[in-house]
Curated annotation (Swiss-Prot):
GO cellular component entries: chloroplast
EC class (word): hydrolase
Keyword Transcription included in the entry's annotation: no
Cross-referenced InterPro entries: Isoprenoid_synthase_dom_sf, Terpene_cyclase-like_1_C, Terpene_cyclase_plant_C1, Terpene_synth_N, Terpene_synth_N_sf, Terpene_synthase-like, Terpene_synthase_metal-bd, Terpenoid_cyclase/PrenylTrfase
Protein EC: 3.1.7.11
Protein known as: Geraniol synthase, chloroplastic
Gene name of the record: GerS
Co-factor binding details: Binds 3 Mg(2+) or Mn(2+) ions per subunit.
Amino acid sequence: MALQMIAPFLSSFLPNPRHSLAAHGLTHQKCVSKHISCSTTTPTYSTTVPRRSGNYKPSIWDYDFVQSLGSGYKVEAHGTRVKKLKEVVKHLLKETDSSLAQIELIDKLRRLGLRWLFKNEIKQVLYTISSDNTSIEMRKDLHAVSTRFRLLRQHGYKVSTDVFNDFKDEKGCFKPSLSMDIKGMLSLYEASHLAFQGETVLDEARAFVSTHLMDIKENIDPILHKKVEHALDMPLHWRLEKLEARWYMDIYMREEGMNSSLLELAMLHFNIVQTTFQTNLKSLSRWWKDLGLGEQLSFTRDRLVECFFWAAAMTPEPQFGRCQEVVAKVAQLIIIIDDIYDVYGTVDELELFTNAIDRWDLEAMEQLPEYMKTCFLALYNSINEIGYDILKEEGRNVIPYLRNTWTELCKAFLVEAKWYSSGYTPTLEEYLQTSWISIGSLPMQTYVFALLGKNLAPESSDFAEKISDILRLGGMMIRLPDDLGTSTDELKRGDVPKSIQCYMHEAGVTEDVARDHIMGLFQETWKKLNEYLVESSLPHAFIDHAMNLGRVSYCTYKHGDGFSDGFGDPGSQEKKMFMSLFAEPLQVDEAKGISFYVDGGSA
């Protein structure tokens, strides 16, 4: 179904002669001539048809608040200092001769959010380390072996799990004496989350160290205690890069051997990127206000700020600001349409809307009720406008493929609406075949590939097949945590049974057992993506974006429905996350330390 349309879309990434706009029948005028602003008219939906309500909370992030964001940390003001500090760190990387010291420095750079500044240097060091036959002493250091294993796998190197054999006894079990090496066990725990499917040794390692770390975490020094608690709450491999950087800077400044230049660079870089995020979010907020769709369709969720949080998590690199804005727009439009299918529209109306999206012409729009016309036209203009920009700049007409992702999404929404209307409970397999699409990742990932496609040209003949699987896995990375966090609330609102309920119905098990099963599927999805990162010829960026969807989804839904409700709850972890990333700059003052806002257990 959805994957059948991916191959021709991906072929547009291949180098081709630059086409004229006229050759595609597209000019800017034709592409956006129906552009609308909805803010000056009254609501356009019928009040005569009985409608359900999602009882969604309003957004707390009003326009004036977003427009007031600003920290003053710009490259122009701090660029000279950043450049000097970068040279200091480059020298540090070059002069560090111990393999363990190099590994630990690279790990610090990643955790401090600096890997993008030293991409080439890190690549060179890891290449050397990957071919280094480490000393006997280092091979017997659990921390060194585990950290090396994790970093190399994170960067796409093949590393065998045989490196952990030295830490097993004659029965093939991890030696009980390892429980005395807390630092080593913590590193092994983090490494175990880079497992592939079938690597039981890493599953055994995770179970072994988890038990011991839980038992001893109260009887260790405060900094190590924070690290253990942080890891057990969520492994490093599953964490969002910027949130981890915010948390780790507070830890690093208290560590023995802290390098002040490294810490200062991390803080300055964080603040400069935060300023870039603020600029992009302000632009996005102006677009949303001008569009006026939230006021017109007041039964839907206004989650623009949350959408930008997701977009920035999916493509955290600061140079991808345009991509972040576009993905945030797409995500907010997905929410609007999702609320129409889930809560507001009748089945007959939804069939008309799905048909209009499939036909993709303004004549089809005329059959829709007024509230759907508003939504259709906003979507129509947005897709054409983005497609026009890509065609103008790169000579690739991606509009047919962008359209197709929305068609597949709406068809999946319609299937679920009919399930709900008829009271049907699908099998888990049947549910997942539809719900990985209905979660909305397909348009988001496709837009990312379209915007970054010129930098991600395929190199293998089986590219289309592999990327199709990445798209599906990306959808699963959102769907499974979403169901774990939101299914109770969504069933109360009136929604199709989620994966938990489908498995309970199919297998005749309790909710706790079903939740464990769905969490197991999430872990297996991670393992598949881990293997793609190492074994696949695909550009790592494709796989990273799918992994980032899992990271932001798990972060958002770990403690409930953090997307629909949590960002608006005073004191919620989700609100704290937003404020720490987008609103509150770090105080770059060694004498005072860092102003710390994110709780160590949730970042």
